[in-house]
């Protein structure tokens, strides 16, 4: 712990999840199962898309990158949380904390841009079907992913460098299960005005703008469906956009609940629980949402399994 009211720190203490000590073993088993499901489920989607040529389309190109990002995003926080629960240790080094901040922001930001790219892909597929292959070219898809990585890397680097310059802290006890930037800034006795201003500014670009783009895309999709109302058209739109809408609702629902309805108490238990939703639960559910009732994914899985069985 800290020896004075203001000093430098070499490590932080992560208080973890708001659970009783006697329940640690149960929650460890639960979160380990969820993390393994996240990794294996998303890896399966990546492999199926790579192995089946019928899935080499813009939609599945973005989905494979989203699956990789989900694995990475969950891996930033879950292994350390599980290790702390297993060893009953709560410490993380200052360097480890800085690294966690960077990669958390990196993959979280990429998630936003990939979901936006997928919404645009669905918009073009439904609203401009005749020009779909021309608009959604391979070069555009690669460019969108590259821009997502470049901007997300810059965003994470800016926040990380601004945090690293903070030298004095009133306390080193973090009321979270990972190094959450907002929770860490509350502990600093240095001036965090610039940090908070940059967070607000970049949050508009990273969260608000992509969310608005997604809403606009689905607004146009809805208008297109209403102009040509038919059971077949509605079913096609639902099968095409339903899974993506579910993922967007889960992801942005958690973010809106966390940042637009913040906790009024100091323990921030609600913030920790909501963080579990978008760092552990949502990445785990995404493979099930995208594969459930998805004939292309299910067909690719059956084809791959039958090939493996026949080879033996």
From Swiss-Prot:
Coiled-coil spans are none
The source organism is Mus musculus
Molecular function terms in GO for this entry? G protein-coupled receptor activity; isoprenoid binding; olfactory receptor activity
| One GO CC annotation | plasma membrane
Known Pfam families for this protein? 7tm_4
Listed A to Z, the keywords are:
Cell membrane, G-protein coupled receptor, Membrane, Olfaction, Receptor, Sensory transduction, Transducer, Transmembrane, Transmembrane helix
**The protein's name in its UniProt record:** Olfactory receptor 1J21
Concerning Gene3D superfamilies, the annotation shows: Rhodopsin 7-helix transmembrane proteins
Function description: Odorant receptor. Activated by (+) and (-)-carvone.
Q: Which family does it belong to?
A: Belongs to the G-protein coupled receptor 1 family.
Gene Ontology BP terms: G protein-coupled receptor signaling pathway; sensory perception of smell
Q: What topology does it adopt in the membrane? A: Multi-pass membrane protein
Its main localization is membrane
Q: Which gene encodes it?
A: Or1j21
Give the transmembrane ranges.
29-49, 58-78, 95-115, 143-163, 197-217, 241-261, 272-292
Q: Does the keyword Manganese apply?
A: no
Q: Where in the cell is it found?
A: Cell membrane
